[in-house]
């Protein structure tokens, strides 16, 4: 019996009322009716969410780890004040403050996924593939489903425990690494720095992933003030 993890055929998220209007992406208004601008209100903050079509979600990586980089989203609602990825605004044309916008990528099915056998695929180099909106849009899960059955090496960078949802898929890959970043153990300070899940939830998720036999990494990005 199959299990459905994500909503399909429904664009309304569980935590807000929104309106949808056409928007100009890279200076033009796409013809695809799926490409829309959505304004969500959550915790008294306004976040602008767009659904966009991209030709290819895989990008040859220039990172030291090599392989390919995959970012199922542009932007990140975790809104970390120290986030290095905010430089991406220079290339995407966003004028909104970092953490207040999110582009949800829709891509064509990956052609011949076995061409990535033996390749390292880093998920979340300039976004977090498991931010709260992933619970409904499921773009990261879709990517893992498309790569299922390959010998690709999967490396996930996140601050979220939502990755536990995809444990069934992750255990199907021969080589998987899940890396969490932690900047402090002071929860009050953490709340001021980012909108990700609590440090306690991250540590509990690390333990569950580790106990499932998956290589687990904790990246300590300490903040000095």
What annotation goes with each model-predicted range?
Residues 14, 21, 25-28, 40:
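Short, positively charged and aromatic/hydrophobic N-terminal segments
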Residues 40-177, 185-189, 199, 203-204, ...:
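Conserved Radical SAM active-site core
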Residues 212-220:
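Short beta-strand/loop segments at the ligand-binding rim of alpha/beta enzyme cores
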């Amino acid at each position: 019996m199959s299990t459905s993890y994500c909503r399909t055929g429904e664009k309304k998220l569980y935590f807000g009322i929104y309106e949808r209007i056409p928007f100009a992406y890279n200076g033009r208004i796409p013809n695809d009716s799926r490409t829309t601008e959505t304004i969500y209100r959550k915790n008294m903050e306004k976040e602008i969410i767009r659904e966009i079509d991209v030709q290819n979600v895989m990008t040859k990586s220039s990172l030291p780890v090599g392989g390919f980089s995959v970012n199922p989203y542009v932007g990140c609602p975790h809104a970390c004040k120290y986030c290095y990825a905010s430089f991406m605004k220079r290339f995407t044309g966003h004028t909104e403050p970092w953490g207040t916008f999110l582009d949800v990528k829709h891509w064509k099915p990956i052609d011949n996924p076995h061409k990535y056998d033996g390749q390292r695929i880093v998920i979340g180099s300039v976004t977090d593939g498991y931010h709260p909106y992933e619970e409904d849009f499921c773009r990261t899960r879709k990517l893992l489903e498309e790569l299922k059955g390959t010998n690709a090496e999967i490396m996930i960078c996140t601050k979220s425990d939502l990755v536990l949802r995809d444990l069934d898929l992750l255990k199907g890959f021969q080589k998987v690494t899940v890396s969490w970043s932690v900047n402090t153990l002071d929860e009050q300070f953490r709340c001021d720095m980012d909108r990700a899940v609590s440090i306690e939830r991250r540590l509990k998720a690390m333990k569950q992933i580790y106990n499932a036999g998956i290589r687990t990494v904790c990246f300590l990005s300490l903040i000095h003030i």
